[in-house]
Design a protein with these regions (language model features):
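Short, ordered loop/turn segments at secondary-structure junctions
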Residues: 8, 34-36, 70-74
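Short coil/turn segments at secondary-structure junctions
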Residues: 2, 38-42, 77
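Short beta-strand elements in bilobed, periplasmic/extracellular small-molecule ligand-binding domains
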Residues: 1-7, 68
Length: 106
C-alpha cells in the first residue's frame, strides 16, 4: 500500500514523528490526525499549541506538505462529530503534493 500509519502516544509526539517521515524522502505528504480534548488543567492549551506550531513549521522546513488534522475540542462528543471531515485531510494532502511538485518542476 502507498499509505503508512504510525501511531503515537499523544498529540505532543505528532511533530517529531511527522518530521521523521517528511525528512525520509519516502512520502509526498504527511497527515497528522488526532484529538486534544480539554480537561481541567492548562495542559490542553500547551499540547494544542505545540502540536499545531510543530506541524506548521514542518511544512515550511521540509517542503513536504504536513496536514494538520488534529481536533481541539471541549468534549469527546465534539471530537467524534468532527471525525467525518477526515477525508478532507487526504484531499488536501494530494492537492498540496501535486501543487508543490508542479511548482518545483516549473
Amino acid at each position: 500500500s502507498d499509505i503508512t500509519v504510525a501511531h503515537v502516544p499523544g498529540a505532543f509526539e505528532l511533530p517529531v514523528t511527522a518530521a521523521a517521515m517528511a525528512r525520509s524522502s519516502n512520502y509526498d505528504a504527511v497527515i497528522c490526525i488526532g484529538a486534544v480534548i480539554e480537561g481541567e488543567t492548562a495542559h490542553f492549551e500547551y499540547v494544542s499549541k505545540e502540536a499545531s506550531d510543530g506541524i506548521a513549521r514542518l511544512s515550511v522546513d521540509t517542503g513536504v506538505p504536513v496536514i494538520f488534522g488534529v481536533q481541539t475540542t471541549y468534549t469527546t462528543d465534539q471530537a467524534f462529530a468532527r471525525i467525518g471531515h477526515a477525508s478532507g485531510y487526504a484531499e488536501a494532502a494530494v492537492e498540496m503534493a501535486n501543487l508543490l511538485r508542479t511548482l518545483n518542476d516549473a
